[in-house]
Design a protein with these regions (language model features):
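Cyclic nucleotide-binding regulatory domains
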Residues: 21-78
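Short alpha-helical segments that sit at the start of domains
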Residues: 116-141
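A residue-level structural signature of the nucleotidyltransferase/glycosyltransferase Rossmann-like core
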Residues: 35, 80-82, 151
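Basic, amphipathic alpha-helical hairpins
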Residues: 92-96, 136-143
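Cyclic nucleotide-binding regulatory module and flanking cytosolic helices
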Residues: 1-23, 60-65
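Cyclic-nucleotide recognition modules
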Residues: 53-111, 115
Length: 184
């Protein structure tokens, strides 16, 4: 979720957060629920299970996320973040604009979880990839010659993780979408 959350906090409120400068490749693991705000840089929030990675989403400047003990936040480029344990947020929630941004994040996380569950339960591999690309196109809003196009700043392996498929299944489905002229 992109937000202007750092702009709504005064210096006293911002001082309640841990400010961290993290190098590319660093990882954040949380023993309890932690709220992380990116001031600069980028990262990805992932689950790992049986040696497989499932990327929940990519994060960048002005994104807020929640990290818990079942996921990891990997830093993809040098980043400046602010983090705080969820248990220490009581005073911050008195700031109405901060509380709204935080609530919006919780709502978006809930909606994302439902979309993931729905796609895992009900959609074919082609449907998962097509729906992911449609959602990404809507978010990026890139147009050329009257057509939407999508910038994929990641590999097919990462795409397969986003849609909950093995790389080979994602590759096959992606090629079928091209063959069926659904994507070009």
């Amino acid at each position: 979720l992109e937000t202007d959350i750092l702009d709504v906090l005064d210096q006293n409120e911002l001082a309640k957060f841990n400010r961290e400068l993290l190098a590319k490749g660093a990882a954040i693991y949380a023993e309890s629920i932690k709220v992380v705000i990116f001031k600069s840089g980028s990262g990805k929030l992932s689950f790992f299970e049986d040696g497989e990675e499932f990327i929940i989403y990519h994060l960048q400047k002005d994104n807020i996320s929640i990290v818990d003990d079942v996921c990891v936040l990997e830093i993809l480029e040098d980043s400046e973040i602010y983090s705080i344990d969820a248990d220490d947020m009581g005073e911050l929630l008195k700031n109405e604009r901060f509380a709204k941004a935080y609530a919006d994040t919780l709502v978006n996380i809930s909606l994302l979880q439902r979309q993931i569950i729905k796609s895992i339960l009900f959609e074919s591999a082609k449907g998962r990839i097509a729906n992911f690309l449609v959602e990404l196109a809507a978010e990026q809003n890139l147009m050329q010659n009257g057509y939407h196009y999508v910038f994929l700043p990641f590999s097919l392996k990462v795409l397969s993780s986003f849609v909950g498929l093995k790389r080979q299944s994602a590759s096959t489905a992606f090629n079928e979408l091209i063959k069926d002229d659904i994507i070009r």
